[in-house]
């Protein structure tokens, strides 16, 4: 997977201290991860839902980004300045080739490329199980075992004095089968073996940056949604400034994080507890 050169957007990237997360193994040996991002400021859930439906199809002209001046590139490259390579919607798509439940997405990226290179690559085709205004869910099934991994994102607008001040963004991942035969246990053991401390450090860093930069580029692209063939981005469009105390931000709902981790730990089938193809747990 050739890696495109880094995009120097000059954004202040959120640190991992701005998220709260935890990991448990349930009674069936499934790995369950819950992650609470800090409040996404200047963003709405409508913007995020629009992005998930469209992002793999979008191209954007980078007007003044060093090394990319005037170049039209995948909008997927804005979603992370160094780790993203390519994304493509395939299968039974919605209107104008948009994502919907039942379609698939092909993803090529790598976790924390600047530190680990291609040590933690992603080159997968995943099924989209949920694509609605309140969230996104995708995963992988294998014959005889069913779901093997499921990533579920939930988001909800947060109001103050009747106005939206940001988005609560909640992420859950389940990996492994709940089945208990010899083959299933061997599969789970292999999966768990790949989830090293280095892997989690790379994934959490990648995900913190990926979600955090919604504040930097998403309002700009969403404002141009009526002309998707002429999307553009320049550095003076950044709505978030350097001085907004990134280091002081924390995961939005610690109680929800702990509640979900406990639920997963007590579960015998984490996919049933996750309810990844149902409405958002945020209500």
Where would I find each of the regions flagged by the language model?
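Terminal "cap-and-tail" regions of soluble proteins that handle hydrophobic small molecules
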Residues: 1-30, 158-283
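Hydrophobic ligand-binding cavity/cleft-lining segments
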Residues: 2-93
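Residues at beta-strand starts and edge strands
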Residues: 29-34, 46, 99, 149, ...
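Generic structural hydrophobic/aromatic packing signal, biased to beta-strands
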Residues: 35, 79, 105, 126, ...
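Hydrophobic/aromatic beta-strand elements that line small-molecule binding cavities or substrate pockets
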Residues: 36-38, 124-127, 148-160, 172-173
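Glycine-rich portal/gate segments that line the openings of hydrophobic small-molecule binding cavities
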Residues: 73-146
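Short, surface-exposed loop and linker segments with low hydrophobicity and enrichment for Pro/Ser/Thr
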Residues: 99, 129-132, 153-168
């Amino acid at each position: 997977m050739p890696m495109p050169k880094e995009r120097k957007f000059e954004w202040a990237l959120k640190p991992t201290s701005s998220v709260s997360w935890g990991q448990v193994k349930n009674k069936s040996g499934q790995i369950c991860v819950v992650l609470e991002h800090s409040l996404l400021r200047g963003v709405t859930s409508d913007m995020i839902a629009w992005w998930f439906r469209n992002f793999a199809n979008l191209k954007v002209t980078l007007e003044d980004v060093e090394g990319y001046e005037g170049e039209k590139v995948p909008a997927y490259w804005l979603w992370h300045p160094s780790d993203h390579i390519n994304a493509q919607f395939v299968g039974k798509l919605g209107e104008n080739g948009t994502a919907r439940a039942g379609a698939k997405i092909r993803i090529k990226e790598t976790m924390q490329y600047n530190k680990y290179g291609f040590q933690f690559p992603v080159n997968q085709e995943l099924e989209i199980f949920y694509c609605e205004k309140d969230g996104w869910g995708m995963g992988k099934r294998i014959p005889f075992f069913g779901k093997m991994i499921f990533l579920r994102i939930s988001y909800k607008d947060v109001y103050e004095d009747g106005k939206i001040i940001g988005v609560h963004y909640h992420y859950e991942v389940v990996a492994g089968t709940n089945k208990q035969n010899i083959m299933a246990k061997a599969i789970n053991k292999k999966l768990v073996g790949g989830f090293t401390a280095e892997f989690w450090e790379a994934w959490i860093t990648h995900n913190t940056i990926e979600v955090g930069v919604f504040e930097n580029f998403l309002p700009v692209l969403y404002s141009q949604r009526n002309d998707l063939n002429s999307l553009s981005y320049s550095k003076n469009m950044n709505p978030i400034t350097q001085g907004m105390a990134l280091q002081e931000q924390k995961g939005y709902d610690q109680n929800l994080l702990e509640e979900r981790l406990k639920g997963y730990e007590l579960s015998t089938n984490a996919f049933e507890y996750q309810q990844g193809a149902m409405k958002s747990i945020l209500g």
